[in-house]
From Swiss-Prot:
One example GO MF annotation: symporter activity
Chief location bin: membrane
Protein name in the entry: Probable potassium transport system protein Kup
Function: Transport of potassium into the cell. Likely operates as a K(+):H(+) symporter.
Membrane topology (UniProt): Multi-pass membrane protein
Domain of life: Bacteria
Record key words, sorted: Cell inner membrane, Cell membrane, Ion transport, Membrane, Potassium, Potassium transport, Symport, Transmembrane, Transmembrane helix, Transport
Lineage: Bacteria, Pseudomonadati, Pseudomonadota, Betaproteobacteria, Burkholderiales
Entry annotated with the keyword Transcription regulation: no
Entry GO terms, CC: plasma membrane
Pfam family, any one: K_trans
Entry's family note: Belongs to the HAK/KUP transporter (TC 2.A.72) family.
InterPro entries, sorted: K+_transporter (IPR003855), K_trans_C (IPR053952), K_trans_N (IPR053951), Kup (IPR023051)
Originating gene: kup
Amino acid sequence: MTDTNHSSMRQHSLQSLAIAAIGVVFGDIGTSPLYSLKEAFSPAHGIPLTPSAILGVISLLFWAIILVVGIKYVLFVMRADNNGEGGVLALMALSLRPLNPKSRITGLMMALGIFGACMFYGDAVITPAISVMSAVEGLEVATPQLSHLVLPITIVILIALFWIQRHGTATVGKLFGPIMLLWFVTIAALGIYHIARAPMIVSAINPYYAFSFMSEHVLLAYVVLGSVVLVLTGAEALYADMGHFGAKPIRLAAYVLVMPSLVLNYFGQGALLLLDPKAIENPFFLLAPQWAALPLVVLSTVATVIASQAVISGAYSLTSQAIQLGYVPRMKILHTSELAIGQIYVPVVNWLLLFVILCIVIGFKSSDNLAAAYGIAVTATMVITTILAAVVMVKVWNWNKLLVAMIIGVFLVIDLGFFGANLLKVEQGGWLPLGIGALLFFLLMTWYKGRHIVKERTAADGIPLAPFLQGLLAHPPHRVSGTAIYLTGNDTLVPVSLLHNLKHNKVLHERTIFMTFVTRDIPYVKDHERVTVHDAGEGLYIVKAEYGFNETPDVKAVLEEVARQRGMTFELMDTSFFLARETVVPTHLPGMSIWRERVFAWMHQNAAKPTDFFAIPANRVVELGTKIEI
C-alpha cells in the first residue's frame, strides 16, 4: 500500500473520530447558547440593553471561548495526558507520580484532585436539569399555549433518559455524532443570518469593547462574569474525554466546527439584540423564523439529551476510576457493551443522580432560576485543573519555572476571576453544587483515611507470608483435592481467611492461590504486564494482578492468564474462593474522630460485596469474618 493510501486512511479515521467526538465531548458546551446570553442580561444584573453593553458582553463571551477553550484546554491542558487519559483524577495521578508520597504538597494535590472530582458531580446534577429544561422552554416561543407543560415534559424526558441507561447506549450512540453535527451547523446558520442583518456586531471581536464594558460598569460587569462562564460549561469534558477519542480528533473538531459555530451563534444572538432588545426574552429561539421554532425545539431537546448522556457517562467513568484508586467504596459496575470497554453502568450512581436532578427541576422550576446554581462547580474544577497542570509542567515535563509561572499566572487570573464572580451567586443557588461537592469530599476523604487506617491495623497484626509458607510446608496440614483462591489486599501478608480456615478446618487445598489486585496510577496496564505468578512450591502460588484506574478487575481473566502461564486448567465448580469479611469497629484509638469512624463503618458495611464487584459465583465463595478496631 502506498504512503498516499496510508495518509488518506489516517485522515479518514481522524475525521470519523472527530465526528464521533462531536457527539460525546461537545454536547455540554454546544448547548450552552440556549441559556448563556439570556442569563448574562438577566434583569437581576441590571445591565442595560444598549449597543455598547451588548457589544461588551459579546466581546467577553468571544474572548472567554478563545482564551479558556481554544488556548488553555485545547493547546495546553490536553498535553497533560496520563498515558492518553484525561480528566481531573488522571491529572491528579500524573501530578503525584514525581512527588514524595509523605510530603505536604502530595496531600494537597490529592485533596485538590478529589475535590475537583466531587465538584464534577455537583455539575453533573445541574447539566441535565438546566439543559433539558432550557430546550423544552422553547415551547414558550414556538407554541405559548403549551408553556404549562414545560415542567412535566422535562421530568418525563429525564426519567426516560435515566431509565434506558441500564440497557446501554451503544446502538443509539452511533447517531450522536451526526445529530450534534446537524446541531452545530444549524446554530451557525442561525447566527450567520442575523450577523448579516446587523454586521456591526462583528466589531465585538475587538477586546476594546470587553474592557470598555468592564470599566464602565465595574461591579455589575463582575457580576456578569458569573454568567459569561456559562459559555465554558463543558470545557472540562474536552480534557476528560480525551482517552476515548485522542487529542487530535478533539482538537480538529474544536477548531474546525465547534468553536466557529458557537462564536457565530453568540454573535447572531448579539445582532438580534441590537435589532430588537426585547428579544432578550429568549434570544436563542427567537433567532429562528416562526415556522422553524418547533423543529428547533425538537432538535434542541435531542441535543440536550445527548449532552446529558455525556455527563451521565462521565459520572459512571469517574466513579469507576475513584473506586479503583481507593477513594470510593466498591459499587456494582455493569458492562453494557461487549465491544466498548468504556460502556459501563453504575446503578447506585444512576438512581442517585436521577433523584437529585428531579428534586432540582421541581425545586427551581425554570432554567433562569437554575442558571445561578450553574457555573461555580465548573469554575472550581477549572482552577483545580490549572493548579494540577502547573505541577505537571514543572515536576513531570521539567519546563522552565518562569515560563510556567507566566502561562499559569494568566490562566489563574482568568479562572479565579470567573470563580470569584460565581461566589457572588452562592445565595441564589450556588450553594447547591458547593454543598454536594463538600458532602462528597467529606465522604471520599473519610473513606480514603479509613481504608488507610484499616491497612495499617491489618499490617501491624499481620504475619509475613514467605516465612509462614516455609513453616507450613515443613509441617503440612492435611491436603484436600480442589483449588482454593484467597483474595487478599496485601501479597506480603498471610490472608486472614487462610488463618481462619487452618484454625477451624485444619486443611489446605492441593492447589492454593493467593491473589492480590493492585491499581496503578496509569489508565490501562498492558496485557503482558498484567499478571505475575510466583511458584512457592507444593502447589502454592502467589498471583499479583495489576490494573489501571480505568479498568475493572476480572478474576476469571486472571485465572485464564495463570492457566496459560503455568499450563493449568481451572474447573470453576471445583474452585473455592476464600474471602475475609471485615467488620469495622469504631474505637477511641488514634486515627479519626469517633463520629467519622462511624461514618466510615457505615460506608464499609454498605459497600458492594466482593462477589458482586469481582464477578465471582456466589455459590463458590466462603466468607470468614474478622473484626478490625480502628
